[in-house]
Amino acid sequence: MIVPKNWRRFWPVAAITVAAIVVVVVHVAADRITREAPNYSLIEDGLWLGGFVPEPPPGCGAVLNLCESEDPYHVGSYKWAPIRDAEPAPDLDWLREQVAFIESERSAGRVVFVHCRNGVSRSGMVMAAYLMKREHWPRDKTLEFLRSRRPGVRPHPAFLQLLLEWEHSH
């Protein structure tokens, strides 16, 4: 390595430059680590699936809330259809109502956000039922598609059974 004879003159400048670079890198990394990603996923244009968040996704005009508690959201159309993430599963009539709400809102051109507490089980079940009906897909293909958009989707076993009943009823 070639070192200039007067390297001691440049040493403070080099040290300050390296320190400044380290500070910038640390701040950028800390910002990325601490910035929370939104707890929702775009399933397709105009259709979001997720968990509870302080604000619904951008441009959202309709919310279907499956949580046991109501939301503070102020959107054009809001439906609260609380269910527990446990057995027994709701019945097919309840599921038809939720799918009809999504269909109605999408037909009106509204962006729809379907959510439960974590965006995993209840909302995954309802979104799967909607897609199964619209696309005429079987349950497993629909869940595979949903997981490609939101990997954490895992409906409760009772909800999986309800989706099989839904598949056979359509």
Which residue stretches match the model-derived regions?
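Intrinsically disordered, low-complexity segments enriched in polar/charged small residues
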Residues: 14, 127, 152-155
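Cysteine-based protein phosphatase catalytic domain of the PTP/DSP
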Residues: 32-113, 132-167
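A phosphate-binding catalytic loop at a beta-strand-loop-alpha-helix junction
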Residues: 109-128
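Positively charged, low-complexity intrinsically disordered regions
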Residues: 9-10, 140
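N-terminal Lys/Arg-rich, disordered targeting/topogenic segments
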Residues: 1-8
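Generic alpha-helix initiation/capping and coil-helix boundary signal
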Residues: 12-13, 121, 135
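Hydrophobic membrane-insertion alpha-helices, especially the h-region
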Residues: 12-27
